[in-house]
């Protein structure tokens, strides 16, 4: 198991230990995850996929992770990262190889840069803002989704 997936397992344990401070869905099956990847034209890294399988979408102590989910009101459409990524492409010019995983009041969009995969299939996490001039000006906020999610969940629980 890679360090990024180990971090995701720690997020799962943290969420399970703090059920009173969090909300989550039931998780995604392989068919839903494959459909989400096809719709975006991107592949989930293993650490994000593990959390999507477990929760689908989740929120802990006010920190919302989009994930992937469907709702009856959505008419079967894939929501969360899929909807946010496709919408950001259409509305604000999000590059096609970035995947939205969170929107934050400090960083604007938190994205995975799928053009920079490592040997484990993990992508670095960046803050992306429609006003940025080029990739070099994006702020790196995590080495992988798993490590980023763990840090954010721990920070949210400590406040």
PLM features: what roles do these ranges have?
Residues 116-122:
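A short alpha->loop->secondary-structure connector
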Residues 67, 113, 141-144:
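Helix N-cap / beta->alpha transition motif
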Residues 1-109, 153-159:
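A surface-exposed partner-binding patch
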Residues 127-154:
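Compact, glycine/acidic-enriched structural inserts
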Residues 108-116:
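Broad, structure-driven detector of short, well-ordered beta-strand segments within folded domains
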Residues 98, 123-125:
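Structural motif
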Residues 102, 113, 126-128:
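Residues in well-ordered beta-strands of folded domains
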């Amino acid at each position: 198991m890679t360090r990024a997936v180990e971090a995701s397992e720690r997020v799962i344990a943290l969420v399970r230990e703090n059920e009173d401070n969090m909300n989550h869905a039931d998780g995604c099956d392989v068919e839903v995850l494959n459909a989400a990847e096809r719709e975006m034209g991107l592949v989930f890294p293993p650490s994000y996929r593990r959390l999507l399988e477990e929760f689908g979408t989740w929120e802990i102590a006010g920190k919302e992770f989009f994930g992937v989910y469907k709702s009856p009101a959505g008419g079967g459409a894939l929501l969360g990262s899929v909807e946010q990524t496709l919408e950001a492409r259409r509305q604000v010019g999000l590059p096609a190889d970035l995947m939205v995983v969170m929107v934050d009041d400090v960083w604007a969009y938190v994205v995975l840069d799928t053009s920079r995969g490592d040997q484990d299939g993990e992508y670095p996490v960046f803050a992306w803002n429609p006003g940025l001039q080029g990739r070099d000006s994006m702020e790196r906020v995590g080495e992988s989704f798993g490590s980023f999610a763990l840090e954010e969940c721990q920070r949210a629980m400590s406040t």
